[in-house]
Amino acid sequence: MENSKIAIVTIGQAPRKDMAEDIQQLRQGGLHVHEFGVLDSLSPSKIATLSPSQEDTDVLVTLLTNGQQVRLSKAKLMPHIQQCLHDLHDFTWILLMCTGDFASKLSFKNLLLPDRMMTNLVKGLHTELAIGLIGPEPDQQITVAEKWQKAHFDVNYSASSPYRFNAHDLL
């Protein structure tokens, strides 16, 4: 693993200030970690075209390097994610830093999906569990709940953005 090249990919822009300390620790541990953002090469006007329409049921939330939170249509973003991952094919591992459900949409042999890891980890710890989940946006409730219900969990969802924290959202 020491000689492995690891790509950490955010669906927003890199570098992500909120992940900088963790990434620095990986580098200090001898790992060859590189950061990439799916939106890195896109102009603000192009990013705006990726906003969800009222018909979009699968919404993703991420950060730009200026700290701005953006809402994105997963369907509109998918070609950009696929291109970014294709460009990184020389990396030993690619970690997509998004908990959206991409298992049926992305099939790269070296791709690590936190969504798949989290649902299987929790399922491995306890097979019948009611769980509370916090997501960035209220309109993510349906897709988040469906994902965890497929893994046979009873889900309660609340929205509070990690990028625009508001304690009132959690009350």
What are these regions (language model features)?
Residues 104-134:
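Anion-binding alpha/beta catalytic cores of soluble intermediary-metabolism enzymes, centered on
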Residues 82-87, 117-124, 143-145:
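Short, charged beta->alpha transition segments
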Residues 79-84, 164-171:
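A short, acidic, amphipathic alpha-helical segment used as a generic capping/interface helix at domain edges
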Residues 71-116:
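N-terminal glycine-rich phosphate/adenylate-binding segment common to multiple enzyme folds
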Residues 16-17, 96, 102-105, 118-120, ...:
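Short, well-ordered alpha-helical microsegments
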Residues 7-9, 92-97, 132:
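Periplasmic-binding protein-like
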Residues 1-2, 85-92, 106-107, 123-129, ...:
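Flexible, charged surface loops at secondary-structure boundaries
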Residues 2-71, 135-166:
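N-terminal glycine-rich anion-binding loop in soluble enzyme alpha/beta folds
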